[in-house]
């Protein structure tokens, strides 16, 4: 071997000589050998004289020993694949001849996570003769299959395959499966099952576990004990006990209370087999004493012991008058000995628990603070639910709607529930201000002008708007739905369904006037005569008679329309109200103090 020369050292002198073995051959290396390994050959003495270079004699022996060990490992691995592990024992005394390793198996499928090779076939050659003293291991017909899946953390083998006889090779090869890009002959289409074998449900395979598919399923041992027949339970008829009260389960999220009559009906409807099973009842142990509960669950009977003396002593030591089991209370019966009867205390206890939970819920709800005003209290000034303690909304007397009768000056109620406090939050917009004619300095109405297309403020309609003048909606007593849609669909709208006023009702009830108005002929004549009187005189001292006639004529004119109205009322003909004709009026109006002058 040449000495190693580093880059830091100086170059060797040119006087050194290098000798190369002329028998060195590269063709002897195979794919499975390492580059430093030399194929084993029988050591022969060189024909030529020994070179001047000295070679360590142990070097070749060490190389030969390494090669022998490698060949031995290859043979052992091959035998492990061919011979079953149960019949093979590794014997260090066996010395096999050095034979070249077989070529690697042909790759069938190669994927990024899976590598599949064709099963290796041992070539039939001359049998290896071993020493007579060395026992030959028996070779089984079962051949361990090669690895079919190699992943990062998991190795899976196929099931054990029996060596097929030589006659099987005469069968034609399985049909090939041709795809678009390749031809696969290793898959047998005739033997592949149509239905995949399902994994058992209770089998658990970890993420990094090794699972063998060739293991036979263990046979379950049949128990010699007689198996009791389990009766099917109808889930729709299942019962639930809540605080000792039985409930029947109707659906998944709904139960109903089961009465005593219905429970007896259910007991009668049971099958005879179930009745025979439940006639004996259940056995309970309470404080060391044995009791039997009847099927109805209403009677608890104590089972007496064999010796009567022991029974009496135990009864005297511990006298049970009351037993509480599962929320139910049993009291000793005064008529029979060792019999306890169920009471209805569990029902009252359930009612008490329910009432307690309800009271706690109400108390917790009363502590909840809300700022939503009560619409009923704002509109009427009174809330019955609030007086009962059920309404949790805000009840503020400052937000009660203002009394409309108070604004007109007509409210005479001493205990009016509506507000008599005039504030801008409750007052509508001043109509005179909208026309521009409001001259009051302390006008209680709201002074702001908005477009007629603006929406009606709903808070103001309810009785109180906290924004007042800063609100961008109209404050008017009108229906918001009618202003928005043009029609109101509310059945009891205060603004749309107003009753007709009293004034319009009176107008409709009044009768019509006659078709021909009464002509005042007398008054017309008298007026003509009055016009003919001289106008030069300012006072009527010289003309007393015409003045008296004028006064009497005015009285007649006032009486005639009243008489006509009475006649028309008696006739009962309805007519709109009309103003009576005045006729010709006098030029001068006489005064009462003119006669004295």
Swiss-Prot record:
Q: Where is this region: Disordered?
A: 515-597
Question: Which InterPro entries does UniProt cross-reference here?
Answer: Znf_CCCH
C3H1-type zinc finger segments: 397-423, 424-450, 451-478
Bias (Basic and acidic residues) ranges: 542-562
What Gene Ontology terms describe where this protein resides (cellular component)?
Answer: nucleus
MF-aspect GO terms:
RNA binding; zinc ion binding
The keyword Phosphoprotein belongs to this UniProt entry's keyword annotation: no
Record's keyword terms, sorted = Metal-binding, mRNA processing, mRNA transport, Nucleus, Repeat, RNA-binding, Transport, Zinc, Zinc-finger
One GO biological process term is: regulation of mRNA export from nucleus
Q: What does this protein do?
A: Required for the export of polyadenylated mRNAs from the nucleu; binds to polyadenylated mRNA, and is involved in the regulation of mRNA polyadenylation.
Domain description: The C-terminal region is required for nuclear mRNA export.
Protein name, entry field: Zinc finger CCCH domain-containing protein 3
Q: Which lineage ranks, top first, belong to the organism behind this chain? A: Eukaryota, Metazoa, Ecdysozoa, Arthropoda, Hexapoda
Identify the gene encoding this protein.
ZC3H3
